[in-house]
């Protein structure tokens, strides 16, 4: 496992990689970023929406910590997991109940992302996207949100025109959300990319890291500026850790430099 937060430290690992393998190092063609907490500023808004939706349906004791632990998962799966904690009668945890709670959650999120003045990209996101594009690396987003919420966010931050973001995938567009690899695979197919070793994944939760591993990505980078801390991400074996998106760019630049040698 390789853990670091500086581009320079990456070179030692890359040199070892290059020594051990005689075949050329794969060229990075695609970077897939998570949205809320990774590229979109979030102040527990998603976790609070979970709390409100569950409270409306008779589950007032869901904590922010419990909700945050489910960040990154598809939202119906997150709701099911939270119900398993707070509903002792398992027969009451039906698909119908989950759908009702999810509908309330979606409506809350649609209203929030459409109207709240705090919605913005995280620091350096657009600069990092532009730098990757100039390096010939496509940029994509995947998310535990459904497509309707995803589209609202893309419109609010000005990423819907395809200039900075080449593709996106929402959890309701694939058979299984994270940590399954289906969203990354959908994006790869859309962009005509066939080798997962030319793809890197970046996200702030355990399921982001595991999604990257399950997709066979070259790198699965955990970013510690969101929900999960470095200590919480390490057990899930990220190939790299970064404190922010600027450090992600340093990691990519260091890899590209070594790949040219």
Regions found by a protein language model. Give the residues of each.
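Short beta-strand/loop segments at the ligand-binding rim of alpha/beta enzyme cores
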Residues: 138, 194-198, 216-220
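Non-catalytic pre-domain segments flanking phosphatase-related domains
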Residues: 5-33, 258-261
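Short acidic, glycine/proline-enriched helix-loop-strand junctions
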Residues: 232-246, 252, 259-260
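Conserved Lys-Pro-Asp/Glu-containing loop-to-beta segment of HAD-superfamily phosphomonoesterases
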Residues: 178-209
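Short acidic capping loops at alpha-helix termini that bridge into adjacent secondary structure
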Residues: 62-65, 161-167, 195-200
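Acidic, Mg2+-coordinating phosphoryl-transfer loop and its flanking beta/alpha structural elements
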Residues: 201-240
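N-terminal helical cap/lid subdomain that shapes the substrate entry/recognition surface
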Residues: 26-123, 130-135, 151
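Substrate-recognition/cap helix-loop segment adjacent to the acidic, metal-dependent catalytic center
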Residues: 57, 82-86, 126, 133-140, ...
């Amino acid at each position: 496992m390789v853990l670091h937060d500086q581009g320079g430290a990456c070179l030692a690992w890359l040199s070892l990689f290059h020594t051990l393998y005689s075949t050329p190092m794969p060229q990075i063609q695609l970077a897939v970023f998570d949205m809320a907490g990774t590229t979109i500023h979030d102040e527990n808004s998603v976790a609070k929406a979970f709390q409100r939706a569950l409270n409306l349906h008779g589950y007032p004791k869901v904590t922010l910590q419990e909700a945050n632990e489910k960040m990154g998962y598809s939202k119906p799966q997150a709701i099911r997991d939270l119900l398993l904690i707070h509903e002792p009668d398992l027969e009451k945890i039906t698909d119908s109940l989950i759908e009702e709670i999810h509908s309330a959650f979606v409506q809350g999120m649609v209203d929030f992302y459409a109207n709240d003045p705090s919605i913005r990209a995280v620091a350096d996101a657009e600069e990092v996207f532009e730098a990757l594009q100039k390096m010939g690396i496509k940029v994509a987003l995947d998310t535990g949100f459904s497509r309707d919420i995803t589209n609202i966010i893309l419109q609010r931050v000005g990423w819907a025109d395809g200039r900075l973001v080449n593709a996106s995938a929402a959890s309701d567009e694939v058979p299984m959300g994270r940590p399954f690899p289906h969203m990354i695979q959908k994006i790869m197919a859309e962009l005509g990319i066939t080798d997962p070793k030319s793809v890197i994944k970046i996200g702030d939760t355990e399921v982001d890291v595991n999604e990257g591993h399950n997709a066979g990505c070259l790198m699965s980078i955990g970013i510690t500026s969101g929900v999960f801390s470095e200590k919480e991400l390490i057990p899930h074996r990220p190939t790299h850790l970064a404190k922010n998106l600027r450090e992600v760019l340093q990691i990519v630049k260091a890899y590209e430099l070594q790949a040219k040698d």
